[in-house]
Amino acid sequence: MKKLKIALLSYRSDPFSGGQGIYVKNVSEALLNSGHDVTIFSGKPLPLVDEKIKVVEVHTPGYFETFNSLERFKIFQAQEKTRLNVWDFIETFTGTFTEPIFFGDRLLQNTEFAKTADSFDVFHDNQSISNYPDSITKKLVTTLHHPIHVDRDIDLENENSFLNKLSIKRWYSFLNFQKKNLKKVKRVISPSKSSKKDICRYFDYPEDQISVIWNGIDLDDCKFHQRSAFNSEFVTIISSDVPMKNLKNILKALYLLKNDGLSARLTIIGDLREVNKKLIEDLGLSDLVSFKPKLPRNELIEILNASDIGIAASSYEGFGFPLVEMIATGLPVIVSDKASFPELAGDAGLIFSSDDANDLKEKMKELIKNHALREELANNSKIRRDAFFGWDEYAKKLEDLFEEIISGNV
């Protein structure tokens, strides 16, 4: 394929937290390795990428680096009082997450973008779904990892206060803008079939304009590990302890397992909220649960190799990187019945009802007691590992979509 000039658009690209910055890094470097010229236009936090990739900062006020109202007002005072800045502040101050709403407007005000916009062959948006002009949307591909409507609905389900529910709805009101803006996009990339289905449902977007491409994942350091001794060591990975990660039901299942007279330990990789720390104490699980904050890659792999069974319990994931990593190391896994997990796990895992701690307990018990089943799932994990691919192959799949956009066949 000929060398393309590609603009990656991302309203924020934190390299250390959440998936968006990691996605931008991996995609941009894979496209660079494929011989393309890549420029990233991003709000803060900026991505950390290969020095051959040009990164252009799109100015954003930084209101969401703090949740202190006085600090936000000070940020506003330091801004030029343009119509855009005033509108952004009012929306922020009244509880809306505004970064994706106004990213498109701020991009158009960026001097570097104004000078170079016409030179790009294709624009690739990373879930900003902002209000881009026709000059961009006619050459635009958007990656939509999953509909954030799901996060909103789960947050609402886990909140009892009427006022807090109103606040949650206000925060997620940017979704109304995104639904309108997505209709102008020629092609959407979804990381799983389940996410594609939900994009159609929540955004009322045409199914035939959504391409499913599993995310690339670097498995070079996730070697298949043959386990010998079995010690009932379970492991789960959470990027952040939010209700969607469903940690509460994992802890309840461990408690039920203990009451059934079975001994098992759980390692939680990630940050813990106080509510779940308290739940561990209240259930008398302190001696059975250990938790590690975000770890260097090598330490993460060591813990996976020292574990016997992995649990991926989220109520929703557009694509579960931790699940794939567990499968790649040969762990038998237990996964929730929601979203992409059954699709990714294939026959390498058991499936439980995500809102049923007793069902999870039964699956844990089954794997503890059934050595032959553990061996079967571990062998299936070894086979399933080959279904996943790296970011260079992902870039090749992107090239096919870019060619469709450029040739006008979409």
Q: Which residues does each predicted region cover?
A:
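A conserved catalytic-core segment of Leloir-type glycosyltransferases
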Residues: S42-D105
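Acceptor-binding helix/loop patch of EC 2.4 sugar-transfer enzymes
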Residues: R72-G95, T137-K179
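Carbohydrate-associated surface elements
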Residues: S194, G216
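Conserved donor-binding/catalytic core segment of Leloir-type glycosyltransferases
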Residues: S228-K245, L251-L254
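Nucleotide-activated donor-binding/catalytic signature segment of Leloir-type glycosyltransferases, i.e.
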Residues: K277-I301
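Aromatic "clamp/platform" in nucleotide-sugar-dependent glycosyltransferases that forms part
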Residues: S315
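Short hydrophobic beta-strand element within catalytic cores of glycosyltransferases
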Residues: P332-V335
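Conserved acidic donor-binding segment of nucleotide-sugar-dependent glycosyltransferases
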Residues: L350-A357, E366-A372
